[in-house]
């Protein structure tokens, strides 16, 4: 009888543990993109990557422009990717300010899901890129999550 009680308790415990582990699975098990909150660490990484495009050190910028920063994850089974779009803000020198004009006025970024991956910046300035005229580097599914205008490659006006 003791063996049966022990076996039953062990079975019940394992079933409970399995159910608990199953409930902890990600809410998006499919390939649906997920909008992510911008963290201080990601913000610092984007400033660093964006500064590369300007040719100026990241220390010459105070951060990212509020209200124009986006961050998402695309859990694609073959190529999971993080996406971001932002504008550097608070240039601390005239040269840094000049380098944020035109081509560098808005930037898009991507990186793979590997923890060692780094952000790849893309200059998207010179005004908005209408989808179709020039391929938008950010997939439409991500732009939809960010609620950008349909078929456009830029955020909605503030």
What are these language model-derived features?
Residues 31-72:
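Short, non-transmembrane alpha-helical segments in secretory-pathway proteins
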Residues 75-78:
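Structural signature of eukaryotic scaffold interfaces centered on beta-propeller domains
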Residues 83-158:
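Extracytosolic low-complexity repeat regions of secreted or lipid-anchored proteins
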Residues 1-29:
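Secretory targeting and sorting signals
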Residues 21, 49, 54, 62, ...:
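Feature targets compositionally biased, intrinsically disordered low-complexity regions
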Residues 12, 23-40, 129-130, 148-158:
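N-terminal low-complexity, Pro/Thr-rich disordered segments
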Residues 59-62, 81-87:
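Short linear motifs at secondary-structure transitions and domain/linker junctions
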Residues 25, 53, 58, 66, ...:
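Polar low-complexity intrinsically disordered regions enriched in Ser/Thr and small residues
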